[in-house]
């Protein structure tokens, strides 16, 4: 298979499935605190963390993490995918966002509030 055909295949697969939506946690390995969030595209969260690690900048991260990221560095944060939302083709963006908000709230309840940003 040539490169162009492979690229077309990958693009078609992406369009069929769309990005992976879900709930994640960024854990500060130095302080033990964590940030629980949700995203329509978990890949973008991974990319933002990688960018912050490579550049040493903190602006790619959530503003609640900036102080600790400046103090300990972005490399002190680990990404954990807590749950991937099964997105059905008939779901609207609003339904996906509502489901993500519910899942995020359920996951937040599992952690000690004093250890969550």
Each model region followed by its residue ranges:
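Structure-specific nucleic-acid interaction/processing domains
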Residues: 2-36, 40-117
């Amino acid at each position: 298979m040539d490169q162009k055909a492979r690229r077309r295949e990958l693009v078609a697969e992406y369009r069929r499935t769309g990005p992976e939506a879900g709930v994640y946690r960024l854990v500060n390995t130095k302080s033990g605190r964590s940030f629980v969030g949700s995203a329509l595209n978990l890949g973008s969260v991974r990319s933002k963390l990688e960018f912050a690690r490579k550049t040493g900048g903190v602006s790619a991260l959530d503003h609640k993490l900036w102080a600790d990221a400046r103090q300990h560095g972005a490399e002190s944060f680990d990404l954990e995918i807590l749950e991937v939302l099964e997105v059905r083709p008939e779901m609207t963006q609003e339904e996906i966002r509502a489901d993500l908000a519910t899942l995020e709230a359920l996951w937040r309840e599992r952690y000690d509030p004093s250890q969550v940003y």
